[in-house]
């Protein structure tokens, strides 16, 4: 996650964008910073149902009990949304993930009101899947 900003810097950078075109470009840029997902991780068990695009999210727990997320999508904007979600959950334990509400962050960014309904549903599906995977680990 060293290539991605922390939550506060994400919000600052997002709010600095002059308009929604710049914000979409920033989201896409964040997606381009995600590490490449291995082919073997593009499996049905890592596939997120409820997304219009193909989305894969892998969750592992490191030796310190912190979750590590990896993901990819076949759509640039969705890959960027994956990066945004990963930033919000960075350095958390599985229990932290289960308890953390991302909605206030999305509201500060005015994110969901500028996404199409299908993208918003896909974003919710990603969050549900991450929380379910975290609950299984906690």
UniProtKB/Swiss-Prot annotation:
Tell me the organism. Escherichia coli O157:H7
Q: What quaternary structure, including any partners, is listed in this protein's UniProt entry? A: Homodimer. Interacts with SufS.
Is-annotated flag, keyword Aminoacyl-tRNA synthetase?
Answer: no
| Task performed by this protein | Participates in cysteine desulfuration mediated by SufS. Cysteine desulfuration mobilizes sulfur from L-cysteine to yield L-alanine and constitutes an essential step in sulfur metabolism for biosynthesis of a variety of sulfur-containing biomolecules. Functions as a sulfur acceptor for SufS, by mediating the direct transfer of the sulfur atom from the S-sulfanylcysteine of SufS, an intermediate product of cysteine desulfuration process.
The pathway is: Cofactor biosynthesis; iron-sulfur cluster biosynthesis
Protein name, per record: Cysteine desulfuration protein SufE
GO cellular component annotations of the record: cytoplasm
Alphabetical list of HAMAP family matching this protein: SufE
């Amino acid at each position: 996650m060293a290539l991605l900003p922390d939550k506060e810097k994400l919000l600052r950078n997002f709010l600095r964008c002059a308009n929604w075109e710049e914000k979409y470009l920033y989201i896409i840029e964040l997606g381009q910073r995600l590490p490449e997902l291995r082919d073997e991780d593009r499996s049905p068990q890592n596939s997120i149902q409820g997304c219009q695009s193909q989305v894969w999210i892998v969750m592992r727990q490191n030796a310190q009990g912190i979750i590590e997320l990896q993901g990819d999508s076949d759509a640039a904007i969705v890959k960027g949304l994956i990066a945004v979600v990963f930033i919000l959950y960075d350095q958390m334990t599985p229990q932290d993930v289960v308890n953390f509400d991302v909605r206030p962050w999305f509201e500060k960014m005015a994110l969901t009101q500028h996404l199409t309904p299908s993208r918003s549903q896909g974003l919710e599906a990603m969050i549900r899947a991450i929380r379910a995977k975290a609950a299984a680990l906690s």
